[in-house]
Amino acid sequence: MSVGLLLITHNNIATSLLETARQMLDTCPLATRALEVPLDFPVADVMAQAKEHISTLDTGNGVLILTDIYGATPANIGKQLCNDFNCTLVAGINLPMLVRILNYPQLNMTNMALKAVSGGHDGILLCECQETEK
């Protein structure tokens, strides 16, 4: 058994990130679900879908929830789920974070959450660009 993974984001971010990570790794070693929150969709309906996903994903080791922006609706839904289920929430999802998690499917939920944060942080770089000669 491993930790389940639920991505809750605005619009098509979760699906796009998950599909890209799967293509890059040629596999997806964790049970995952993507849930998008349209701007005009009733929160109660999204919450019901999220609870169904949690019930499917949690095989006894909990569910790591990744959201896009802390304080926005997807993260608020995630926070509520953490109050009701065995979940951990990490906000600020990016592709390096997701790839890092999928490379360590054997971790417990606490260590996976820490790996998510380090992967997301390490994947953000200020790149120096040199002018090219004309």
Regions found by a protein language model. Give the residues of each.
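N-terminal loops that bind phosphate or other acidic moieties
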Residues: S2-L64, I69-K134
